């Protein structure tokens, strides 16, 4: 089978399967795929995006996949181009996102011969398995769960010898949906606690909310923007061992990965009866202490204790009333998340922003939240936000300045969607000032990493629309009066050391207030 026929066969099958979004990086060896994709786009069958940087292209595709829950294909030429997909491939693997990576390759006979732009691409994106393709295959049984790597061998000639009517009669089939998992039934204790990780183990918010109602237990959510009944600021006040002891549950159900808060993980570790629910192959039970592991949301046999739930709800209300924030990164997060419009999307950058959302955002609904929590990296965050924005009328992103600069090349090929990116400018890696590393010698050089850049000028250099804000009122104005298209809001906050001190003060003040409430602790 020649290169043109092989490429057309693959693209035709993908379209029939329901793949509608393709992200292409230009190259020579992937020319058969590039030409086939252009023809499919011209026929109105697919959405084709072209990104020159493979690393950013993969994260862009990952963003579309996160927002659509459908396979999105990303295509490149051979050699180092393929290696640039590895960060996004790892994130997709650990998040089980539907990312289809297609790398073009030379024929197998040219491997390890010194042929130009040729390396061993089979296994290049481990732990992803590689499907090495030299002739037509049936792809439908390959696209089931999580990311997939197709490595396609193209021999010369790479250009079509005829026009061909290969798209005639082509129609997408219904998109693949995950098969339902058999529900189990479990008996639960009256004084329990439901804890939901940010990724929710892939379960729908509505399904988890139903489980919470059936349990009649309090709920702690790493994503408070999806669960209005969540206990407010729990990760802050449960840093206190006395409060953890006072509110110690008889049983905990954990859904997904809880990776943001040491205090919540301490609460889990101190409970003798923990049930973990996660359908993925990597079980989310870091200390191997779970008494039971389930792969689906169970039916529950419950004997609710109304006093237990009321006690927790009272705690949550008291926490909301007794948290006081000055202008800081914490107030920035609280202000943004409170004022986001309904039915908008929010991408939350790794490191400090996602932890502050978990700790300081008031529980609410109406916001579709996304984050790269598979490996929690700071790379590719702008590109991921660009991809998510392709699927929503209004999208927002919150990034730290180092995270922003790490993917700055994405601005060379920006999205045209309505996206506002908030950049928290504290001149360096703010999270390290809140960790034990803050006290080591040489901290600023090896952890703080100040960049000393004028981010407004950097963004303007890419032709971006940018404003700088220094107050909550200006920040609110930038949210409720957004301009169309891509917009950047650089947020000037106190220095990193001051922010770390404010975080300690807020936490200690809240803990003291809750401990003094005689009816709460």
Protein language model features and the residues they cover:
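N-terminal cofactor/phosphate-binding cores enriched in small/glycine residues
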Residues: 4-75, 81-83, 360
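Active-site diphosphate/adenylate-binding microenvironment
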Residues: 7-15, 28-29, 33-37, 313-392
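Conformationally flexible catalytic loops at phosphate/diphosphate-handling active centers
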Residues: 29, 125, 139-190
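Glycine-rich, anion-gripping cofactor-binding loops and their flanking helix/strand elements
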Residues: 62, 66-67, 78, 84, ...
